[in-house]
Design a protein with these regions (language model features):
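Ankyrin-repeat-protein effector appendages
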Residues: 1-4, 143, 150, 154, ...
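Conserved ankyrin/ankyrin-like repeat signature
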Residues: 16, 48-49, 81-82, 114-115, ...
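Ankyrin repeat domain, specifically the short helix-to-loop turn at the C-terminus of the second helix
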Residues: 18-26, 51-59, 84-92, 117-126, ...
Length: 195
């Protein structure tokens, strides 16, 4: 029955999902990767199925063996529609990625500007959360990207929404120093405006 449930979720077949649940399927069943039907629907951009599953008792915050849930999935894979839906459904913004960051961290690092803007302007997500190596979203956006115009806008967005430019990584290195080390002089100038 679970294979049918996962297939129906992937296809967004709400009628099949309804029938399976009426016949005893577990709405929070897990596949080999610990994915639930709602995560499978989310990964396949089946937004109506995501909403339906959530409204019928699916746990929207359950994470798979890679720490993905629908919210983290949307943040990492630049799916603004999914991120907005999960926030609307009341997802837990404190769920962490496998590296210990919240959804803002990979969105900033990967240059998903619209998601970063949405999260900062519409939620109370922790902009200064540190991951397993002491990196904030601000630090990740500097270290793991190209320093280009999009990243400059993201850096400014983070700083405009109270990212702390004095927080250092676990080795005591500041965002300003990291920007200079990477040769990102424009980002360094932006950070200096907030010091």
């Amino acid at each position: 029955m679970n294979v049918k449930l996962f297939t129906a979720a992937a296809e967004g077949n709400i009628e099949q999902l309804r029938l399976l649940l009426e016949n005893g399927a577990d709405i929070n069943a897990r596949d080999k990767g610990k994915r639930t039907p709602i995560l499978i629907a989310a990964q396949n951009k089946q937004y109506d199925a995501v909403r339906w599953l959530a409204s019928n008792g699916a746990d929207i915050n359950t994470q798979d063996n890679k720490c993905f849930n629908p919210f983290i999935q949307g943040c990492i894979h630049n799916d603004l529609t999914l991120v907005k839906l999960m926030v609307e459904l009341g997802c837990d913004l404190t769920c962490l990625t496998r590296f210990g960051g919240n959804g803002l961290t990979p969105a900033a690092e990967k240059g998903h500007e619209e998601i970063v803007r949405f999260l900062l302007e519409n939620t109370d997500i922790n902009v200064n959360l540190t991951n397993t190596v002491g990196w904030t979203a601000l630090i990740e956006a500097i270290i793991l990207n190209d320093g280009g115009e999009k990243m400059q806008r993201i850096i400014r967005l983070l700083l405009d929404h109270d990212a702390d430019p004095t927080m250092t990584d676990e080795w005591g290195v500041s965002p300003l120093e990291l920007a200079y080390r990477k040769g990102y002089h424009e980002i360094a100038k932006i950070i200096e405006e907030y010091l």
